């Protein structure tokens, strides 16, 4: 790896994403963010020799050599523009909760200030014959959140629906060719913010950002304001 962030990889982290941004608010409940960010996975393998060495190390330990893929380095710098708006409760009379829309554009840079040249898919990884730049799979994002009112609570507020969020992502090169959809439902059960989610598409992991997968899960969502 040959950049400032690559030399000091984050410990026990698979997605490192610092961003500097300027936020401009207005009186209509919306804001704009203009940012410069860096995203990486904190790994070090960036050539076939290092990959083969790691591969053989796993084999020598009687583990699958393919585990070496987890050490492949990924990193990008990008510029971004975000717009978010919280709509008045009475925008849709049939819904008495709060609706929030968010749009984001990230342009991944060919030579960033922090990363330098991007570290993305290498053809030596699987003998491929074509590039798979990140902008084919990511860069345009839209999310729609609905924050439920307290009317959606039962058993004396021991169970409440908190938030429903739909997220759609695609690349800005060949738009809508590679799409990712995520649906999340957050509830509050006895004070615990339990989240159910399902995802279909790309970017489930920075190493394999170009692989199409379907996944779902259950977790806890803690948000600090």
Write out the residue ranges for each language-model feature.
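Outer-membrane beta-barrel "beta-signal"
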Residues: 196, 213-225
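Histidine-bearing beta->alpha loop at or near hydrolase active sites
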Residues: 203
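Outer-membrane pore/translocation modules
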Residues: 1-176, 197-200, 211-212
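Surface-exposed substrate-engagement region within the catalytic domains
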Residues: 152, 172-175, 180-187, 191-193
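Short proline/glycine-enriched turn/loop segments at secondary-structure junctions
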Residues: 206-210
């Amino acid at each position: 790896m040959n950049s400032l962030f690559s030399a000091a990889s984050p410990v026990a982290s698979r997605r490192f994403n610092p961003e500097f941004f300027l936020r401009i608010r207005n009186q209509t409940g919306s804001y704009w963010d203009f940012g410069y960010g860096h995203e990486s996975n904190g790994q070090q393998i960036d050539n076939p020799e290092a990959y083969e060495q790691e591969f053989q190390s796993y084999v020598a330990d009687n583990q699958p050599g393919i585990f070496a893929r987890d050490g492949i380095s990924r990193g990008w710098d990008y510029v971004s523009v975000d717009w978010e708006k919280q709509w008045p409760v009475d925008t849709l009379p049939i819904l008495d909760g709060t609706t929030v829309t968010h749009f984001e554009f990230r342009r991944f840079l060919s030579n960033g200030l922090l990363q330098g040249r991007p570290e993305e898919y290498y053809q030596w990884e699987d003998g491929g014959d074509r590039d798979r730049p990140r902008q084919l799979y990511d860069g345009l994002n839209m999310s729609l959140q609905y924050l439920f009112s307290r009317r959606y609570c039962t058993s004396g507020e021991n169970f409440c629906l908190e938030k429903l969020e739909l997220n759609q992502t695609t690349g800005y090169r060949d738009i809508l060719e590679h799409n990712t959809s995520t649906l999340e439902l957050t509830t509050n059960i006895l004070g615990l913010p339990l989240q159910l989610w399902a995802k279909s598409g790309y970017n489930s992991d920075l190493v394999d950002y170009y692989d199409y997968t379907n996944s779902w899960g259950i977790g806890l969502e803690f948000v600090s304001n």
